[in-house]
From Swiss-Prot:
Range of residues in the leader sequence: none
Record-given protein name: Small ribosomal subunit protein uS9
SUPFAM superfamilies (alphabetical): Ribosomal protein S5 domain 2-like (SSF54211)
InterPro entries: Ribosomal_Su5_D2-typ_SF, Ribosomal_uS9, Ribosomal_uS9_bac/plastid, Ribosomal_uS9_CS, Ribsml_uS5_D2-typ_fold_subgr
Gene name of the encoded protein: rpsI
Classification of source organism: Bacteria, Pseudomonadati, Pseudomonadota, Gammaproteobacteria, Enterobacterales
Organism per entry: Photorhabdus laumondii subsp. laumondii (strain DSM 15139 / CIP 105565 / TT01)
Gene3D superfamilies from the UniProt entry: 3.30.230.10
Length: 130
């Protein structure tokens, strides 16, 4: 591995992402595929690019990312969290800007478990008075 490489781990819902950044031309590779191929949805691509756009590093860093677990939205959020942590390892002065944008904090919301006797986590079966 390169000596000028920085690492960050990101998590969101049931997804976890490992992000490696190094100076380069702006290539983003996710699970050996490009960002455009991996995420079909434009919103997911925007979420991934958010921290890089905020600190003006979009074309200056190469990203190599492995992500597993969860769905599209969770994976995009995990990647964003990982990129944020890797950027902080790269340059600690970026922390305050990233914190203000809310990217540093891990989104702790998880799926609520299904309860016995209910149809979903909170949805009760229909009540019949008579």
């Amino acid at each position: 591995m390169a000596e000028n490489q920085y690492y960050g781990t990101g998590r969101r819902k049931s997804s976890s992402a490992r992000v490696f950044i190094k100076p380069g031309s702006g290539n983003i590779v996710i699970n050996k595929r490009s960002l455009e191929v991996y995420f079909g949805r434009e919103t997911a691509r925007m979420v991934v690019r958010q921290p890089l756009e905020l600190v003006d590093m979009l074309g200056k860093l190469d990203l190599y990312i492995t992500v597993k677990g969860g769905g599209i939205s969770g994976q995009a959020g995990a990647i964003r969290h990982g990129i944020t942590r890797a950027l902080m390892a790269y340059d600690e002065t970026l922390r305050s800007d990233l914190r203000k944008a809310g990217f540093v904090t891990r989104d702790a919301r998880e799926v609520e478990r299904k309860k016995v006797g209910l149809r979903k986590a909170r949805r009760r079966p229909q009540f019949s008075k008579r």
